[in-house]
Amino acid sequence: MCIRDSIKMSGCPNGCGQHHIANIGFYGASIKVGEHTIPAYVAHIGGNYEGGEVVYGERLKVRLPAKRVPEAVERWLRMYESERVEGEAFNAFAERVGRTRFEDEVRELALPIEFSLETMSHFIDWHRGEPFQVIRGEGECAV
């Protein structure tokens, strides 16, 4: 791969995981499908923190089911490798092609998943054995 930049991910939408200043960043979300919920992520593209300069990544307008995030990252990296200008850094590429191009590359991955035996794994979060639930509680950030 020709990317040497950062990918940051947090299950929480707060900024502690610094997803918003990563070249590719994700924060946790969910997708409601009838009475069921899919663990999901919202992506940011083009963020950076270097030499005291902060650039917030642009939030994509797609929610990706958690189990489809690795494929989304692979698609974006392949897109970058094949469409970049010689020597073009990832963030410069992201700025040049725009948010919509990144959204279009993964739009089919964000399509709703109907609940069935074949799709059950999408409704279970990574390293868990039971269906995903959004559980809200008092968080550290609220103190």
Regions found by a protein language model. Give the residues of each.
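Peripheral terminal and linker regions in Fe-S/redox and tRNA-modifying enzymes
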Residues: 3-143
